[in-house]
Amino acid sequence: MMENYKHTTVLLDEAVNGLNIRPDGIYIDGTFGRGGHSRLILSQLGEEGRLLAIDRDPQAIAVAKTIDDPRFSIIHGPFSALGEYVAERDLIGKIDGILLDLGVSSPQLDDAERGFSFMRDGPLDMRMDPTRGQSAAEWLQTAEEADIAWVLKTYGEEHFAKRIARAIVERNREQPMTRTKELAEVVAAATPVKDKFKHPATRTFQAVRIWVNSELEEIEQALKSSLNVLAPGGRLSIISFHSLEDRIVKRFMRENSRGPQVPAGLPMTEEQLKKLGGRQLRALGKLMPGEDEVAENPRARSSVLRIAERTNA
């Protein structure tokens, strides 16, 4: 059941300003959430402007459907498929900006029934779209110990990944876990050294959530597609919340902001260099939340906004 959650959109003005909105432009909000970014974009569009929003969370879709605006449309699906959505609408190369607000949203974290948080007991689910795929409980009950350890180490950067994975498998053999509180307790008991500033289950919950939702693969595919769908001068405005996300975004923007990499001393004609293509993006820098925003919304502390512009190449 969906409740009315107060949701403060992180880096709201900065992310939308990064799109450099044109009144008649066509924009994509790849992570609609509760619509903070979408509503601000719509307020800056003229009658000819268009906004295509995407979200895989059915609760977000329900909120989006309350927006009665002919310039706005919502798609229920993963943002990794934005290339397909754009192609279906014959808009390849015509998109003036894409905004992505990565990771889990505050309403998802705060709703115990979604199973994202170790702070609230609820079903051990963690799916951004509960209608598709395996829940966290289902995966943890069927996965091999080595696979669980790999996920915890890779996506949670968990120092005690092997110990925690062993404890999870042993607990599931005795009695399958179905609640977030059960997983949090198992992880805490298996963690020999506690961080006084961080709950011992923090990294495990992050890792399992990322795995269950294929979050990093989603980001990589969306970024790859963005090069095809953006018009020259179109902007990418992307907010990430942890180092794994930001690393992918930073690397993508850096690699595509370079010209062709040719070994030193390799003789090439101007025609050959032209065929290699020029840089496809121009990185415009990064922004982080100010002290006032962090004080008002502590979850903003780790956020990073990166902006880039599509070139004519």
From Swiss-Prot:
Pfam families, alphabetically?
Methyltransf_5 (PF01795)
Give the enzyme class: transferase
Q: Which purpose does this protein serve, as stated in its record?
A: Specifically methylates the N4 position of cytidine in position 1402 (C1402) of 16S rRNA.
Q: Report what the protein is called.
A: Ribosomal RNA small subunit methyltransferase H
Keywords for this protein? Cytoplasm, Methyltransferase, rRNA processing, S-adenosyl-L-methionine, Transferase
Task: Please list the reactions this protein catalyses.
Answer: cytidine(1402) in 16S rRNA + S-adenosyl-L-methionine = N(4)-methylcytidine(1402) in 16S rRNA + S-adenosyl-L-homocysteine + H(+)
Q: What is its EC number?
A: 2.1.1.199
Q: What Gene Ontology cellular-component terms does the record carry?
A: cytoplasm
Q: Name one GO molecular function term.
A: rRNA (cytosine-N4-)-methyltransferase activity
Cell compartment(s), UniProt: Cytoplasm
**Domain of life the protein comes from:** Bacteria
Gene field:
rsmH
Q: What are the GO BP annotations of this UniProt entry? A: rRNA base methylation
Q: Write down the InterPro entries for this protein, in alphabetical order.
A: RsmH, SAM-dep_MeTrfase_MraW_recog, SAM-dependent_MTases_sf
Q: Which family does it belong to?
A: Belongs to the methyltransferase superfamily. RsmH family.
State the PANTHER family in the record: 12S RRNA N4-METHYLCYTIDINE METHYLTRANSFERASE, S-ADENOSYL-METHYLTRANSFERASE MRAW
Q: Which residues bind S-adenosyl-L-methionine?
A: 35-37, 55, 79, 101, 108
